[in-house]
């Protein structure tokens, strides 16, 4: 998109109105025609509201093509235009409680509702309340109960024919249920995509190496407006009916709630999250109830809709140019907003994960003022092409951490700077490393880094590590926050007086912890290695390292090639171990832990080198009775030669050694074509000769 003209100040209403019209029309085109929305709803609403106010204050600024005089965008090429028999109008918006009270008062006054001396309505208005779905509005046309046409809203007067695509939506009946159906019925409703279906669609997009959709609304709109209905058929779209256009051949239901019940009797999908309430208090009660469950709903909504329930009262209230007077959309606080990204810092997590964080000009979004937002990782920053100085879209939903969704490239300043991942931890100065095939970079100073301190201490004290009973998370929190412990080595410097002064820590608890620390000084090499918290080194790998090297120093000094010789240690684990011990800060803490009077363990000899003969790594099965060797003796000899002795025959078996009375294992070996040896053949293998 080309760069837009400079933003004129409010002191120039003519220029300001022209600029606002331009911004809104660009947004409409991107949303309705290109299916590539580039402006958050909150920003669109703000600009639209400003233009409305300008035109109210300066009526001479109103133009026939102003966005305030129509509903949406132009009809896209590739689809046949459809003129709606009844316009598909949008709704006016309300945001604050005061807006809802004012709406109720306008409606009550217009309907001549009676009030008491205090001005309160004694005969409150009856409203039908529904959800405001975040999808694409469409109209379904049924003739004598048979589905004949579907069209999008378009500009409210003329939409696009999407009949063949809508036929693929399984929730939409192609024929209405019941013996008595209208001669003509225009059903208004919303095409949307459920959250679970959206997640599955994006999984398929990733697997096919195709572009992912930003959100369910974009996915629904893009899927519905495919030129090839076969593509739409592969997309998991849903539909909810919520309104009516034209009806012929049957009387109109007396209320809106009755209309929705009527739709259900025809087999049309109608959302059950609806209610009939009275007055402003009833409206606000419904809004709050829905707000509490919003995040748990299986689909996205951006508010609720209020409609005067009685049809005769709707008719009395009528319409303004672009919206009905009898209805209002009550929108939740915007979940997306625009602001400027002023810097990108990195923060260090409890496990050493380095996360880029956007520092933002303050913006109100999702019900709170946001100044920071996560950028997840370096690859995400590159993929989204986010730069310092950009105007960015910030999203905050519920209690979810705010995130930067993307940048508006057309607003990018010439001096926008790319993000560069630091090479040293901003907290402790240790090296930042990123393992192959991992998206997250990490600080390698696990034992030393203050940001990882609590996690390192908690892991060190685990039952499978040093097993320091009584050192729980709450005690660790106090020790760290009072600056009594910086590294695991400091634990062994704690005294009774210090521990006894901790909050809610009695003298007996202090003594028990000291006894546990004294006991922890006598451990095993495997437990100590596990307690260091090396990434990808679990309890089993720690045992393998201890068994292979016998003592700690050879492990600390081992090359990646030497580490790869350890059982079940692959390239990623070897790289992680090597990085950990290459960091001087970690080696310093280990040296402190091994100081006199601290942690000790019995040293053992390194394991013998693995055999390299013809049996090394081979799988052998023993069956039957051998003339001179017991089965246990044969097994011991095979394992000493580097073979694995298995209990059953499979395609992975290399040899079967068969003696007298060999049974089904011999038959299975012959069936699979596996070499079968007698005792002499076994001895040849053990001597290094291939039989």
Swiss-Prot record:
Required co-factor(s) are: Mg(2+); Mn(2+)
Q: Reaction catalysed by this chain?
A: NAD(+) + (deoxyribonucleotide)n-3'-hydroxyl + 5'-phospho-(deoxyribonucleotide)m = (deoxyribonucleotide)n+m + AMP + beta-nicotinamide D-nucleotide
Active site residues according to the UniProt entry = 132 (n6-amp-lysine intermediate)
Q: Where does NAD(+) bind?
A: 41-45, 90-91, 130, 153, 190, 307, 331
Q: What class of enzyme is it?
A: ligase
GO biological process: any one?
DNA replication
Asked if the record carries the keyword Disulfide bond, the reply is: no
Q: Which GO terms describe its molecular function?
A: DNA binding; DNA ligase (NAD+) activity; metal ion binding
PANTHER family for the chain: CHROMOSOME TRANSMISSION FIDELITY FACTOR 18 (PTHR23389), DNA LIGASE (PTHR23389:SF9)
**What is the protein's known function?**
DNA ligase that catalyzes the formation of phosphodiester linkages between 5'-phosphoryl and 3'-hydroxyl groups in double-stranded DNA using NAD as a coenzyme and as the energy source for the reaction. It is essential for DNA replication and repair of damaged DNA.
* Family classification: Belongs to the NAD-dependent DNA ligase family. LigA subfamily.
Q: What is this protein called?
A: DNA ligase
